Amino acid sequence: MLINFFVLPIIGVLLFLGHLGGFVGLLSVRAAGILFVPCHWILVFYEKVCRLSVSLPGAVWITGQPDWQKLLLFYLILGAVLFATKKMKQRRGFVFIGCFMLLAVLHNPVKGFELDVLDVGQGDGMYLHTKEGTNFFFDGGSTDVSKVGTYRMLPFLKAKGVKKIDYWIVSHTDADHISGLKEILQAEYEIDHIVFSKYVLNDEAYQELLALAQTYGTEILKMDCGDTLTDGEAGLRCIFPDKTYKSDDKNALSLVLRYEDQEFSGIFTGDISSAEEQYLVEHKKAGSVTFYKAAHHGS
């Protein structure tokens, strides 16, 4: 409705000049080009209005992917609403109640603990939802899947009904760990924080990601060894690297985190090598876990 307030008053001008320019173009391309100039700027104005409307609070609803039972219930309620609008006198109240019920049916957020490892090809991408309702995402990129963020990661998040990521963990800045994250930032999906290691290499990829985060209002956090992101009874603790470990290798300085709650524990390793794994064992930083993400894609 709001968009129509801006679109409808000048759509007649757009159609008139567009058709006129088409006919004039049969005689003179130059003259038609002059007529198409205002058409171009009207369309640019429409695009700006649409982009602005999408950015308004509540403009985009992420409902999640419902199961077949909810879809069946959705169509039954929809049919009842349509039938009632024809038969009942108090239509408005019934329609309002029906619409509210439809929204309730279509709202499908993730509930309870969940860990998903996404198929992103040559790369990494994992989603973790805690019992408290906090959303974590670990890395997110690929070198052999085109637009992995647009066509795999973002559809996954929307299908799960995830409206935002609270903490997006970046183990390091290789393309197969951040290419999808960059696409999701550019899609203006809400990410509250991006988390790096305190010892992340300050390279071009890191600076590019910082610039994107600043553009889209995402806060940057850095974790040192021993730092913990707490979430009720759960915690995500940095166990590597620490200030004593020196390397110029981006993979070797991957941020390694240990997640633990009362029923589950897991280690997320990035692309560390066997040398860093041995370091974790020798310094007793790993411990036994329920889940271990094979380092460097299992290499």
Protein language model annotation of sequence segments:
Residues 4, 15, 22-299:
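Non-globular, low-confidence helical/coil segments that flank catalytic cores
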Residues 8:
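Active-site pocket-lining/capping segments in soluble small-molecule metabolic enzymes
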